From Swiss-Prot:
It is found in: Cytoplasm. Homodimer which binds Holliday junction (HJ) DNA. The HJ becomes 2-fold symmetrical on binding to RuvC with unstacked arms; it has a different conformation from HJ DNA in complex with RuvA. In the full resolvosome a probable DNA-RuvA(4)-RuvB(12)-RuvC(2) complex forms which resolves the HJ. The gene is ruvC. It comes from Ruegeria pomeroyi (strain ATCC 700808 / DSM 15171 / DSS-3). GO terms for molecular function: crossover junction DNA endonuclease activity; DNA binding; magnesium ion binding. Belongs to the RuvC family. This is Crossover junction endodeoxyribonuclease RuvC. It is an enzyme of class 3 (hydrolase). It catalyses: Endonucleolytic cleavage at a junction such as a reciprocal single-stranded crossover between two homologous DNA duplexes (Holliday junction). Its EC number is 3.1.21.10.
Length: 165
């Protein structure tokens, strides 16, 4: 199963693709989507188009995205939510099932503690995906989100099916 992880951001959105075969994980690709300028609509469209390119090139089977946390900067949180919304819309248009994970859960899964530093996440992603060179902290976070989904995604899908039944 191929999993696309997304770390949403308006200025820089990280993405990472991993392959899961049984309990084995391997790195496929990772990168950053950038949006600059003053026009919010154009920036969101740019992110959408870049995510579409990633999906078309790497053909993931499932996706995972980090949940938004609310902080003291309301305007910043709103912009993050808009970028996350565009990412979710793009994934839905591609027909991908999406898992959503809290930042602390991702860090606890990959590092072992929920309040890990960026450097710890990067280090553990490299250990769990040999040969992987993340193209930045946001790409490493996206790979960590994909790893988290590899561990919890199947169980989450199963529990959602059980709730519906």
């Amino acid at each position: 199963m191929r999993i696309l992880g997304i770390d949403p951001g308006l200025r820089t959105l990280g993405w990472g693709v991993i392959e899961q075969r049984g309990s084995r994980l391997s790195h496929v690709a990772n990168g950053l989507c950038h949006s600059d300028g003053d026009d919010l609509g154009e920036r969101l469209l740019s992110l959408h188009n870049q995510i579409v390119e990633v999906i078309e090139e790497y053909r993931p089977d499932q996706a995972a995205i980090e949940q938004t946390f609310v902080n003291k900067d309301g305007a910043g949180t709103l912009k993050l939510g808009q970028a996350r919304g565009v990412a979710l819309l793009t994934l839905a248009q591609a027909g991908l099932p999406v898992g959503e994970y809290a930042p602390n859960r991702v860090k606890k899964t990959v590092v072992g503690v929920g309040h890990a530093e960026k450097e710890q996440v990067i280090h553990m992603v490299k250990l769990q995906l040999p040969g992987c060179l993340p193209k930045g902290a946001d790409a490493a976070d996206a790979l960590a989100i994909a790893i988290c989904h590899a561990y919890y995604g199947s169980a989450q899908a199963l529990s959602q099916r059980e709730v519906r039944a």
